[in-house]
Amino acid sequence: MNNKDQNRERKTKTIISITVIILAVYTLISGCGTNGGKQTQDALQIIDNALVSYLGPEGTYTEEAAQFFFGDNAAFIPRSTVQEAIEDVVAGNADYAVIPQENTLGGAVVNYVDGLIAQDDIFVVGEVILPISQTLMGIPGTALEDIKLVCSHAQGIKQSEQWRKEHMPDADTQEMGSTAAAASYVAEAKDKTIAAIAAPGAAKLYGLSVLAENVQITDANKTRFYVLSSAKPDETGTNAVFVASCEANKIDDIIVEIHNAGLELVTIHDRPEGSFLGSYNYILEVECKNGITDKQLKSVTGFSEIRYLGSYGVMEKHN
């Protein structure tokens, strides 16, 4: 990349940053915000006795999110990857999929971003927010000083980094497909030098002993999960999500249109589009506490680069 291209990219990033700041101020004034207006599952059109695919195995936070959202009105299918869960819905093998979306400490779950971008016939119909309490666990009889290797999902490793530096600075880490997969691995290994960081319930499920609780950086740790369907939602909720595929210097025009439509930009995640440098796929989430209207959606989807992924309400579980 030459100096001219680098300057253009820096300028574009500056424009986006300034635009987001302006939007934040605007939404505080206009009344669109993250408090209130949250729909419950009762307000959504959920299929009875649904088949729900989720990022497994049993004992993951994704399973907890799925059970919280659907209750007893569903059968649950654990899958090894986010992509497998999404493909179940696309192929008609499941009515819904539940996947992790974003964590307050670890940021966006990259697999979720890539999975949504890759599918044209998948929609977001709900969101679940869970409090996350990461727990260190090992086989019975394990002491902290025994541990040489800590296994977890990438998010669990990132969220516990500060605690591990203080209490087991010499222990290595190994990423697993999920926190529950890490707990299962430790149970099968039967090795006191290996521990897992997972949800508290995974310890009981896999016969492990809890060595330390709340090893995440902060008690404010939360993860958001998407509920996906192959059916486009008929009703609009308080939130909506879009995919924008464009060059970096065009995304600010879309952000301004979101502002003009009276919507709050909640999050924006980007991934390289893959065809040439400077082109990206963006996941854009918007919100308005009074509910999003069809007119607002049409205003945003007027761009040829925009693909609508759904409008939905949010359920949050509290400790």
Spans of model-derived segments:
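N-terminal secretory signal peptides that target proteins for export/translocation
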Residues: M1-T12
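Domain-level signature for soluble enzymes in the chorismate/prephenate branch of the shikimate pathway
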Residues: T14-N319
